[in-house]
């Protein structure tokens, strides 16, 4: 398929260039030409795509006030959106809103365990797991970086679902040739591993993320680039499957499984080829051409393999450092990072949760906020906002600003608590977020109690129009962590955002 430019309604945009055996290249076989075409909005399009609905980007632009537009446009060339808690903070919505002002939105780590829920201009809900949230913005190119583990059946299912709902993906998604392939058997092993751990289970999404990263680290994993060499693909896959069978007696492997998988992946390879690219070269080329790049983090810092509540963590680095290793870009080019944090705290699965509300209050938050996992559907544990953990996340990532989400969920509460200090059993204060899980189980949390506002704030769009108690809550968080809150979510829709 050779498409040079597309036009949606009255706005010309560019999309896929000529496909090539080595990925999506520009008109002269280089990645740089790809960007030149992507930005040529005034040239006559060769293909017209008609739409009966208004452009989401136009609707969004009209919904952003002057101060909001100024906030967005002031973000650095390479910016990022990262989670500040244990995931599910609402990162996808902010990425979706910001994407219109960026040329590229990129995923750098994780896999289909990252569930991002976003809504289009008509209020239709999209649950994405691998495809970057910028896909709903027609002029945005989406990149799945080398640090992501890719389950091809899941990726194709997402693409098919988007296409069926009028969202064009062809020529708008690049998949790194260095990304590792996540197979169905990785998911099976994930379940066997949880059963093996019995009572000490980690509570994974069972999407095969950990086993796939394990294959990567012990160096017998397969990468997207291996799909270009189907002559030796069966031998590599046989080695991987044999290793899994040796490690897990419950995993049954035989010649039929290998034969079936090879046939499946021959078809997958053919379908994936137009999306494959050397994204490391692509991203650095984009940076040198001053293209604006938005990095979308999956999961969150408190699930980081190094900085999270280990071992109750994910298998990648959803912190600032994961941006560089997961995309192949230099630390010096990474600019503003926006941390996304709920106005309260949630967590899915096992692991320490110091500010968890164990009584009916937790249930009230869960149902008011519809706290059920995008990926698993599991009910999330709920608690008060943990300032100690949030300050730790801000320290690690160096956030320029924060997006406080779901402030509207707290509207019916007579009073709201903030967990401001951790104390040892003897009453002495901890100076930092501890790595010791036993200590985390023993600590006592000291709370500040603030008044609630007992009024619906979901239709408010100006910060000064918020109830005084709501503003005091926001400003107290800023005082405690020392990072400004620039975005406040007061509902799930794209327009339900206050720019502060």
From Swiss-Prot:
Gene3D superfamilies in UniProt: Adenylosuccinate Synthetase, subunit A, domain 1, Adenylosuccinate Synthetase, subunit A, domain 2, Adenylosuccinate Synthetase, subunit A, domain 3
Further comment: This protein may be expected to contain an N-terminal transit peptide but none has been predicted.
Record pathway: Purine metabolism; AMP biosynthesis via de novo pathway; AMP from IMP: step 1/2
Annotated EC: 6.3.4.4
PANTHER family, alphabetized: ADENYLOSUCCINATE SYNTHETASE (PTHR11846), ADENYLOSUCCINATE SYNTHETASE, CHLOROPLASTIC (PTHR11846:SF18)
Molecular-function GO term, any one: GTP binding
UniProt catalytic activity: IMP + L-aspartate + GTP = N(6)-(1,2-dicarboxyethyl)-AMP + GDP + phosphate + 2 H(+)
Function, as annotated: Plays an important role in the de novo pathway and in the salvage pathway of purine nucleotide biosynthesis. Catalyzes the first committed step in the biosynthesis of AMP from IMP.
Keyword line: Chloroplast, GTP-binding, Ligase, Magnesium, Metal-binding, Nucleotide-binding, Plastid, Purine biosynthesis
Cofactor: Mg(2+)
Domain of life (superkingdom): Eukaryota
Family affiliation: Belongs to the adenylosuccinate synthetase family.
CDD domains: AdSS (cd03108)
Protein's recorded name: Adenylosuccinate synthetase, chloroplastic
Active site, UniProt feature: 88 (proton acceptor), 116 (proton donor)
UniProt source species: Solanum bulbocastanum (Wild potato)
Cellular component, GO, one term: chloroplast
List of residues binding GTP: 87-93, 115-117, 380, 406-408, 489-491
Gene assigned in the entry: PURA
Name of the top EC class for this enzyme: ligase
S-S bridge residues: none
UniProt cross-references to NCBIfam families, sorted A to Z: PRK01117.1 (NF002223), purA (TIGR00184)
Binding site for IMP: 88-91, 113-116, 205, 219, 299, 314, 378
């Amino acid at each position: 398929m050779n498409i040079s430019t597309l036009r949606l309604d009255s706005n010309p945009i560019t999309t896929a260039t000529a496909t090539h055996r080595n990925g999506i290249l520009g008109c002269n076989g280089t990645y740089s030409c790809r960007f030149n075409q992507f930005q040529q909005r005034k040239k006559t399009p060769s293909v017209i795509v008609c739409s009966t609905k208004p452009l989401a980007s136009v609707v969004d632009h009209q919904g952003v006030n002057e101060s909001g537009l100024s906030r967005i446009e002031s973000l650095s060339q390479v910016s990022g959106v990262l989670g500040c808690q244990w995931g599910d903070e609402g990162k996808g919505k902010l990425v979706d809103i910001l994407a219109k002002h960026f040329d590229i939105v990129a995923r750098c780590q994780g896999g289909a365990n990252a569930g991002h829920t976003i809504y289009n201009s008509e209020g239709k809900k999209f649950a994405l797991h691998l495809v970057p949230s910028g896909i709903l913005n027609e002029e945005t190119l989406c990149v799945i970086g080398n640090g992501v583990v890719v389950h091809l059946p899941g990726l194709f299912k997402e693409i098919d679902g988007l296409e069926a709902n009028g969202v064009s993906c062809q020529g708008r998604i690049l998949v790194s040739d260095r990304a590792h392939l996540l197979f169905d058997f990785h998911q099976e092993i994930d379940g066997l591993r949880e059963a093996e751990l019995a009572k000490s289970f980690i509570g994974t999404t069972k999407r095969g993320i950990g086993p796939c990263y394990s294959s990567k680290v012990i160096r017998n994993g397969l990468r997207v680039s291996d799909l270009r060499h189907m002559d030796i693909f069966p031998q590599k896959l046989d080695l991987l499957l044999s290793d899994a069978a040796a490690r897990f007696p419950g995993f049954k492997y035989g010649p039929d499984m290998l034969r079936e998988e090879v046939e499946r992946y021959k078809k997958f390879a053919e379908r994936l080829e137009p999306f494959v690219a050397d994204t490391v070269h692509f991203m650095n080329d984009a940076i040198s051409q001053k293209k604006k790049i938005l990095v979308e983090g999956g999961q969150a810092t408190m699930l980081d393999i190094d900085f999270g509540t280990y071992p109750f963590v994910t298998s990648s680095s959803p912190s600032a450092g994961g941006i560089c290793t997961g995309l192949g870009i230099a630390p010096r080019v990474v600019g503003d990072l926006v941390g996304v944090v709920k106005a309260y705290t949630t967590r899915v699965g096992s692991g320490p949760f110091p500010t968890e509300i164990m009584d009916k209050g937790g249930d009230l938050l869960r149902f008011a906020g519809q706290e059920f996992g995008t990926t698993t559907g599991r009910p999330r544990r709920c608690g008060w906002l943990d300032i100690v953990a949030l300050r730790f996340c801000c320290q690690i990532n160096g956030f320029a600003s924060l997006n406080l989400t779901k402030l509207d969920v707290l509207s019916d509460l007579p009073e709201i608590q903030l967990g401001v200090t951790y104390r040892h059993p003897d009453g002495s204060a901890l100076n930092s977020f501890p790595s010791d899980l036993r200590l985390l189980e023993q600590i006592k949390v000291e709370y500040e109690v603030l008044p609630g506002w007992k009024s619906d704030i979901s239709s408010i769009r100006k910060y000064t129009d918020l109830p005084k108690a709501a503003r005091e809550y926001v400003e107290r968080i800023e005082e405690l962590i020392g990072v400004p809150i620039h975005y406040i979510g007061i509902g799930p829709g794209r327009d339900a955002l206050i720019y502060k």
